Amino acid sequence: MTDFIGADLRGSRFERTDLSGSQLWAVDLSGAGLRGVDLTRVTMRGVELVDVSIHGEIQNLTINGVDVAPLIDAELDRRYPDRAKMRPADRAGFGEAWDILERLWAGTVDRARRLPPELLHESVDREWSFIETLRHLVFATDSWVRRAIRGDPSPWDPLGLPWDEMADTPGVPRDRDVRPSLDALLALRRDRMATVREVIDSLTEDALDGDTQPVEAPGWPPSRSYPVRECLLIVLNEEWEHRLYAERDLAALDAARTAGQGSARPAAGCRLSGLESPTSQAWPNGSVKPPWRCTPHGTR
């Protein structure tokens, strides 16, 4: 264990660093940026939270004695009435949720088509471009539907895109340099969305409540059994949240173009939320934490 007492570490970069169990006393974190940070079971006392923006997976967050997580969920459901339908309880609910996502994504794609094609490869505020977002959703479907539910040991298309921090895994593509056209990605997306539709339509209630069979091959997710319901909920969440991010960033790109300011700030996009990790983590109930889950609108 190393002690830093009176140290000047301003501007330091900590990446893939284990600081679990650390004690921070009278520490200046003003202006700090935390991304993909696990703050599970962190206790803060006597802190000053002024002009702070937090986007992430929030559960059991108590601020000044008040659990604010239910309040946040309720407000997001109020802003987006269809959001609550992304937590279906039965097969019919999953079908309705997928209907909603198909409709919403059709509108988002129409909006993207109104921009110059080159802007669809642009990053806004270090997030994935629109094309990269579509590639990531292909990867999500391949991983959780084609591999986990349908049992294909190697379902990935070369254009699929895992999250940036995912460890290299045999057979899993991660080509960040390829620049496919929108039409090429949409053809792939139509195929994957049709696959999800087929799975949902063919499910019985018993199958929905069942578990997948482990796929005995390296890949993602890791080889083990998963609740079928959990696999589909991950896909619904990915589709819902990433569309909101895409809408936000398309609006920024369009505004910058209209204002004649050129492209938005390009940078390598990556998304890592509190449930997005290169390694699976155990929930208190013993199940495996979904390896990624997009966070509420505002970050990826």
Indicate where each model-derived feature is located.
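Tandem repeat scaffolds
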Residues: M1-E75
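Active-site-adjacent scaffolding segments
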Residues: H55-D110
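Short, contiguous alpha-helical
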Residues: P117-G171, A194, D211-P266, C270, ...
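Single-residue "anchor" positions within short linear motifs
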Residues: P278-Q281, G298
